[in-house]
């Protein structure tokens, strides 16, 4: 007679073992119809799961985050069933849930084409409409291996063969299709009402480039058509803003395969933006009391052994290079170099805090399949800073860092943040006292700044607690950029010291800090946030001077020179093209201001001003215009003229 306790604390007793579906029906017909799965004593199960003893139970519907995951996982299986129906020789491999959707990898003799995806999706809709019951069964490992080998599914057999002997293997069946899965799944395929296949790509079996290439079909699934349509709209908007496409259109950067994937080439316009970003960064840090370092790109292998990178980070580092009987490696991080600068001389407690910053280029080994434009690269510039301070200075330094972080991010147009504090994990270096004091200092600083934050208990690195700040872009996506990380490990490894007030030697506290993260990645985020229409202070060309005929060429050169002398990035287009063609071309290049020069403007020493949005601002005196533009650039705001 199981006693079922529901999330609201109410209880229901049954005379015999009951399924999750039975309990939902006992509560109400509407809930029974909506039920997708259950959570029994904290574990997700199918609605067919039999409850024999007293238990807590939550009925999972499409309103629950777990319900959406069940829908997506079940839709991945629906995809696999459709592929097997249409292409019987295809072998199924894995089909996990990912952010906003799912994928499934197939081994097939040829690549899937877009028209294949249309056929597969149509078959999925037929299978969903058929409302096929989904049932779970179990086998032992060896039986399951034999079963899938008999089906010609060698990849599934390999997956199961890697599972420890003695473990029970669960299988799910819908129609004639059977697949390996832990579950849970929806009760029937009719619960899958809103899905879309989005793309196909190559993927190596088990992510290993030495293995065979598979076909990965991506898709998305939602509780209803409205949510699906909303997501597809966001997807289309993200595609419109894709930094790789815009970067090519605006001639900002490229990845040259002749040089190697994941290595960024900054073109002149992109370099202009990078210089603007970096100059602002240097100015802000100078004002905040930082000093700047420049450090090498390689170091002796012994340094990476001392820092721990050789033991714990070697998979992300490039192989050592032998030279003069020494082994050198490209740096994956700047931190040990800053430590060496600190150790170059003995410091007093009066010297602290020391705030050192560097735009340091680092190199990390990435699988080619993981590379993605500017967002995931092999060589990138980190806006690193390290603060060396006393324990009693932690809170004040964290406050200063938060002030600087928010000011910098807001200057780039990001005002919406998610803040997370990660605390001590089970295995950690440093005393309980220092962890408690440091964590309390981080919390106090966040609260003094009035920042809402979530706490990830036990989610910190083994060497110290940290604060992560995620920004939201124009279409609501989150990007991890800023990190504040305390480190109790490197000061110990490198035996860092300062002379305390009582003449004793003590370890300094080391704070790692990045505001932008990777400059390349942050640039990619900026491109997508603004869809290439950068605010005036960041635009690679802020003003484009356009002539109607060659009679205005000298005046155009003069106008461009005068603007450049005011620190405004201005170019002159003197080509023998129609003015309408020039206006359209530079509008597509997202130039904030177009100055059209004809005979009248030349005679009156004025300029006709247009914005990239197409607004005609009329004739203006150049001095007046340059004053206003220079003011806007200096304030790093959006142009009031364009607004």
From Swiss-Prot:
InterPro entries cross-referenced by the UniProt entry: aa-tRNA-synt_IIb, aa-tRNA-synth_II, aa-tRNA-synth_II/BPL/LPL, Anticodon-bd, Anticodon-bd_dom_sf, Beta-grasp_dom_sf, TGS, TGS-like
Limits of the TGS domain: 1-61
GO MF entries: ATP binding; metal ion binding; threonine-tRNA ligase activity; tRNA binding
Matches recorded under Pfam families: HGTP_anticodon, TGS, tRNA-synt_2b, tRNA_SAD
Alphabetically ordered keywords of this record: Aminoacyl-tRNA synthetase, ATP-binding, Cytoplasm, Ligase, Metal-binding, Nucleotide-binding, Protein biosynthesis, RNA-binding, tRNA-binding, Zinc
Gene Ontology biological process terms in this record: threonyl-tRNA aminoacylation
CC terms in the record's Gene Ontology section: cytoplasm
E.C. number: 6.1.1.3
Amino acids binding Zn(2+): 335, 386, 512
This protein's record includes keyword Repressor: no
Superkingdom of origin organism: Bacteria
Catalysed conversion reaction: tRNA(Thr) + L-threonine + ATP = L-threonyl-tRNA(Thr) + AMP + diphosphate + H(+)
Intracellular or extracellular location(s): Cytoplasm
Cofactor binding note of this UniProt entry: Binds 1 zinc ion per subunit.
PROSITE patterns: AA_TRNA_LIGASE_II, TGS
Family named by the database record: Belongs to the class-II aminoacyl-tRNA synthetase family.
Function according to Swiss-Prot or TrEMBL: Catalyzes the attachment of threonine to tRNA(Thr) in a two-step reaction: L-threonine is first activated by ATP to form Thr-AMP and then transferred to the acceptor end of tRNA(Thr). Also edits incorrectly charged L-seryl-tRNA(Thr).
Protein name: Threonine--tRNA ligase
Species: Thioalkalivibrio sulfidiphilus (strain HL-EbGR7)
